[in-house]
Every structure is written in structure tokens, then in C-alpha cells.
């Protein structure tokens, strides 16, 4: 994919908004900062941050903050999460409120129009972009999208904001677990996020030296896992590291779901299942660590800060040139743009021919029943 040249023409885009939607991750504040500086310094635009995603647009008056240089004097660049707040509670066309499901799309569109914005930059994952694109079409909103997700599963971009930070956190966890595994001669199992994509588990597994890497895209067997652990024992290695993505299924094909305090059922618990099955069939002692939200809230890595900053600059240039309904992407070591529809219609999971799969195999990891 060739990089598309942006012509830096001054238009009549003078007032823009930013919102972050969906789950938080490292690099969001860096993106917001970059958007502000490009818009303000290059184009003399006013920039407004909308609080708590689309929820800020449903409030009356709308919940916004005018961004200034003063806003970014502190440590926002280095902080995880988003200082504007976010929301991942579902579809705005079917939004849960006071025990009911309501359509908040009209409120959001009215809120957007009340601000007299010339354009809106949305920072979100595939689900958020799908909903916001639908809102934009209905309300004739001028939007540009920036992809962010620790899962790295947004189509049409090789990298999304937040992924590198999540991998770094998972790698550090494996580093820490290795010493305790060796001390007690145990098998330590680390369960990581990623939804239906195994990018975090695969990348962190390689970086952290995992002996077993289980991802949703490649079928495995408990016997295959045990065979690997027994081979290690024969080589006088009495401890092991296993990393497993949250959407890996049981051997019978069912997903493991956990019911949380809010009543919602979400992916979680596959690590305990793997440990239980290993201990049923062997004398290997297992312990499980579920990494959870620390993958989202950690300070962003240098890679995520750089990617977010580059995305922010490019997104502002798209708005300035009235190139709406585009998504910023990273392909072939360059920032490019694609239609938002292209970004949300494709799903980016781990392919069998991914070079990192072969890398993991070459390093001796068990990664499933690969023929």
C-alpha cells in the first residue's frame, strides 16, 4: 500500500473535537497531545476534548474541555489511559441506561452539532469505529478515525495504539514469573488479553521466552502441552512458562467465560482450565496469573508514544484537507490512510504463515498442533 501524500492546504476547518472510545490503553494521551499541537500550531484550530467518549455528547450542556497549551504542561505524555475518559458500555443505538435499553444516537448528534465543530477525531477500536461511523452517517458528522486497541486486531493497519505497551507488560510479567517458577520448580501460566486475536500472547511469548504459547487461531491439545513439559523435564529443566490468550478454547471447543461483579460475562479463566488439566494428568505443580487490566493502564512504551504522535499529526492533516471518513493506519513503516469502512470490515488475527509463528516454533515453543 502506497503512502498517500497530504497537501497541506489551509481550509476553513477551524474548530475540531477529539473523543476516546472503548477500552483504554497506553498511548491515548500521546495521541490527544499530538492532535492538539498539530491543529493549534499548524492550522490555528480550536480543539475541544469530549469527555467519556460519546457520553459527553449526551449531556446537557455537553461535557467538553477546550484544550490549551496549559493542558499538556504536566505528565500526560507519560501516563496510561486517557485524561478525557472513555466508555465501553455498548452500542449507542442500544445503550443500557437505568435498567433499560435506549437509543442515544439523536442526543449524540444534537450534542455534536451544538458545538459547531467542523470535524471530529475519534480514537477507538473496531467496535467503536463501527458505531461512530454509523453515527457520522446518520448525523452528517465529519470524522477521521485513529485505531487503538491492545488486541491489535483492527484490519487495514499493521499496528494500533496500545498494542506495544500491552506486549511489554506481558513480557515483564513472564520475566518476573520465570524466577518464581525456577525457585519452586513449577509451571507458571500467564493468561493475557487479546480478545479473539493472539497477538499479545504470541509476541510476549517470544519476547519472554515462554515454553508454551497458546493462541485462539491455532488448535492445541493438553497432551501436546504435557509432552512439551515432559521433554523439558528429560532435559533436566524442572520449571516452565506458559502464556495463553484469553479466547483460547477448551479442548471440547467451548470458550471459558467469567461472570464479573457487574453481572457481565466476559472472557476469562482459560489459564485455570489449562492448569487443572495438566495437574489431573501429571504431577506437575501449576500456578496461574491473570494479567488483566494492567495491560491497559501501564505507562506507554516509546513505540506507542511515537505511533500515537504520528497518527495524531496525520489525522489533523486529513481534517484540514476535508478528507473525512478516513482511518489513519500504519503500513510498510509509513503512516497512510484508508476508508474507515475498510478498517472495520476486516479482522486482523494471527495467520498461520505469520513469520512470528515460525519464530516461536524455531525457538522450541509448543504453539499447538501444527503439521
Annotate each PLM feature:
Residues 6-61:
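N-terminal phosphate-binding or glycine-rich loops at protein starts, especially the Walker A/P-loop
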Residues 25-35, 57-58, 102-106, 120-133, ...:
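Short glycine/serine/threonine-rich phosphate/pyrophosphate-binding segments
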Residues 111, 122-124, 130-134, 139, ...:
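Accessory alpha-helical/coil subdomains and C-terminal extensions
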